Swiss-Prot record:
Protein family: Belongs to the bacterial flagellin family.
Lineage, highest ranks first: Bacteria, Pseudomonadati, Campylobacterota, Epsilonproteobacteria, Campylobacterales
Gene transcribed to yield this protein: flaA
Cellular component GO terms, alphabetical: bacterial-type flagellum; extracellular region
Key words, A-Z: Bacterial flagellum, Secreted, Virulence
NCBIfam families: PRK12584.1 (NF009234), PRK13588.1 (NF010115)
Role: Flagellin is the subunit protein which polymerizes to form the filaments of bacterial flagella. Important for motility and virulence.
Protein name: Flagellin A
Length: 494
């Protein structure tokens, strides 16, 4: 038998549920989202909102890192140009560091170097990003947020690359050594990790000894100590060579012999020729300057010990000392006495740190007077690239070893401007090297930071994609499943 259902309440409830399901399904299909309101999935909405925020923050972090990379690239290219300038400065300083150059040609080279330094400073002062100067020393301790949460950042600093902040060179020169000794030195290592004891060297006038050998030992270890050395063993007489005779002239225990009828200022060169005839044995080379003064130079860095009897015919049968007996700043060599000059030791360090000599055997006896580095006997100075623009003063002249004997020291108190002297040109070479090392250090640090930023961008780009995918799976609708659900409710609603 047929039965007619008249449960209107049940039918109304069923129809309402069907319409609600149809409405929700249609909303999901039209928006493409599974979660359109908190009621759809409260916990899922919380998680997906968090993922969405994370993905958005990661997108901005990628932009931040790319901005940082751009800034670093601007600074790096600017410093690359500065390095090219420094290379040119060193080449020109090397060109000036030979005595084939006249004072005028050196002045021309100095003018070129001044222009180059001004160009370097112009780059340092004008390189900027978004109105911020990058190479003037003001752009330090900057941060770039490269993560989702606060303080996930990379710090960047760019040191100053202007001439007043780079090219520091520390120079020390000891007093002239006048007594034989033996030196065993220990230097602090360049990285501060310990000390580097050097082999002992005898300071005397025999072959294979002297400050020249000590300088070679120091230079062999410069990669560990950061210190280079130069020995200057040279003697100049105080006055013009006077006419007369030299008897029993001996240099470094090698008998030169008797030299008679020496002309004033050694006009005919007989004194110089006699000394140079035995240079291979004595290690000493002689010459006269424009004032007729005798100059003796050690060719291998050993000491110079000079002995002679000097006489001049005064017409009264008496003998008088010649000017040659006033060498080494006035030390007499008449009556067979010996005048000894073992030279001066100059040390160079291509940064502003002090040069520290120590002794691992006797740390309480670090006087070093035997090599001219005793208390209050050391000339010290620090110069930088900016100093090349002006004149090197008296302190720089002494510290660079230009005052290698008392006669030279009594002359012009200043070293001169930049490369206008041989010693100055060599000092500018060291300054250019030091400046290059400073710029290379800054560039390498920036390169490391740039590499870190690139790796970070690569990492968070992948992370962002995965976070977006996770958020999409949670928030977005499955069209196939939801279409089937919609069709079900649509059929029920008919």
């Amino acid at each position: 038998a047929f039965q007619v259902n008249t449960n209107i309440n049940a039918l109304t409830t069923s129809a309402g549920a069907t319409q609600l399901g149809l409405k929700n399904s249609l909303e999901k299909l039209s928006s493409g989202l599974r979660i359109n309101k908190a009621a759809d999935d409260a916990s899922g909405m919380t998680i997906s909102d968090s993922l969405r925020s994370q993905a958005s923050a990661l997108g901005q972090a990628i932009s931040n890192a790319n901005d940082g990379i751009g800034i670093i690239q601007v600074a790096d290219k600017a410093m690359d140009e500065q390095l090219k300038i420094l290379d040119t400065i060193k080449v020109k300083a090397t060109q000036a560091a030979q005595d084939g150059q006249s004072l005028e040609s050196r002045k021309a080279i100095q003018s070129d170097i001044i222009r180059l330094i001004q160009g370097l400073d112009n780059i340092g002062n004008t390189t900027s990003y978004n109105g911020q100067s990058l190479l003037s020393g003001q752009w330090t301790n900057k941060e770039f947020q490269i993560g989702t949460y606060s303080n996930q950042s990379i710090k960047v600093s760019v040191g100053s690359t202007t001439s007043d902040k780079i090219g520091q060179v520390r120079i020390n020169t000891g007093a002239m050594i006048t007594a034989a000794s033996e030196a065993t030195l220990t230097f602090k290592q360049i990285n501060g990790g310990g000390t580097s004891p050097l082999e002992g060297v005898k300071i005397s006038h025999s072959v294979g000894t002297g400050l020249g050998v000590l300088a070679e030992v120091i230079n062999k270890n410069s990669d560990k100590t950061g210190i280079r050395a130069k020995a200057s063993v040279e003697t100049t007489s105080d006055k013009e060579i006077m006419s007369g005779n030299l008897k029993n002239l001996t240099i470094n225990d090698v008998n030169i012999g008797n030299i008679v009828d020496i002309k004033k200022g050694d006009a005919d060169g007989r004194l110089v020729q006699a000394i140079n005839a035995l240079t291979s044995s004595t290690g000493v080379e002689a010459s006269t300057d424009s004032k007729g003064r005798l100059n003796l130079r050690s060719v291998d860095g050993r000491g110079i010990v000079l002995k002679a009897d000097a006489s001049e015919d005064n017409g009264d049968g008496k003998s008088a000392p010649m000017a040659i007996d006033a060498v080494n700043g006035g030390q007499s060599i008449t009556d067979g006495e010996g005048a000894a000059n073992y030279g001066r030791l100059s040390l160079v360090r291509l940064d502003a740190r002090d040069i520290v000599l120590t002794s691992s055997d006797k740390p309480d006896e670090n006087k070093f007077s035997a090599i001219g580095f005793g208390d209050n006997n050391v000339a010290m100075a620090t110069v930088n690239l900016r100093d090349v623009l002006g004149k090197f003063d008296a302190s720089v002249k002494s510290a660079s070893g230009a005052n290698y004997n008392a006669v030279i020291a009594s002359g012009n108190s200043n070293l001169g401007a930049g490369v206008t002297t041989l010693v100055g040109a060599m000092l500018v070479m060291d300054i250019a090297d030091s400046a290059r090392k400073t710029l290379d250090k800054i560039r390498s640090d920036l390169g490391s930071v740039q590499g870190q930023m690139v790796s970070t961008v690569n990492n968070i780009s992948v992370t962002q994609v995965n976070v977006k995918a996770a958020e999409s799976r949670m928030r977005e609708v499955d069209f196939a499943a939801e279409s089937a659900e919609f069709n079900k409710y649509n059929i029920l609603a008919q």
